């Protein structure tokens, strides 16, 4: 039996944060993704995973939501100065570049002057933190894709 109902289109966000030692900070950032400005839970937003690497002092928070909720990325860049958002996959229209293609294009694993890069949303990357620039002691890089 097949269903004619179209499933929910999802988007995922890989939020890279330059913090791993203070677990409560990473958890608070993850909780912030789940709540609206009134403290109520967004019904279609989930934190799928939190990975913290003590050696590299960074954490990656994987967030999934309905494609309809992608305005959250725009809200985030307004409320977190220095946040850069790079889109890939179905979110990267019209090119639809994969994460690997975007990282190569951005020189993600090479030393380069990131100040010339323009993110899809948010501030240009800073020299201090590279692609994950922020003025608040945290460094953020967001990648959005649809699946």
Swiss-Prot record:
Record carries keyword Signal: yes
Signal peptide residue numbers: 1-20
Expression across tissues: Widely expressed with highest levels in liver and skeletal muscle, and moderate levels in kidney, bone and pancreas.
GO cellular component: intracellular membrane-bounded organelle
Pfam families on file: FTCD_N
Keyword annotations from UniProtKB, A to Z: Signal
Listed GO MF terms: folic acid binding; transferase activity
SUPFAM superfamilies: Formiminotransferase domain of formiminotransferase-cyclodeaminase
Family designation: Belongs to the formiminotransferase family.
Official protein name in the record: Formiminotransferase N-terminal subdomain-containing protein
Organism: Homo sapiens
């Amino acid at each position: 039996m097949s269903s004619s109902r179209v499933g929910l289109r999802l988007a995922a966000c890989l939020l890279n944060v330059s913090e791993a030692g203070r677990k409560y900070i990473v958890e608070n950032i993850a909780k912030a993704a789940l709540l609206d400005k009134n403290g109520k839970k967004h019904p279609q937003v989930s934190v799928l995973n939190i990975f913290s690497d003590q050696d590299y002092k960074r954490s990656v928070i994987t967030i999934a939501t309905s494609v309809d909720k992608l305005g959250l990325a725009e809200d985030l860049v307004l409320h977190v100065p220095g946040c850069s958002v790079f889109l890939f996959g179905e979110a990267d229209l019209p090119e639809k570049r994969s994460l690997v293609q975007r990282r190569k294009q951005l020189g993600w694993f090479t030393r380069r002057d990131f100040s010339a890069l323009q993110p899809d949303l948010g501030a240009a990357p800073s020299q201090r933190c590279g692609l994950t620039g922020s003025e608040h002691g945290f460094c953020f890089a967001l990648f959005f894709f649809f699946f």
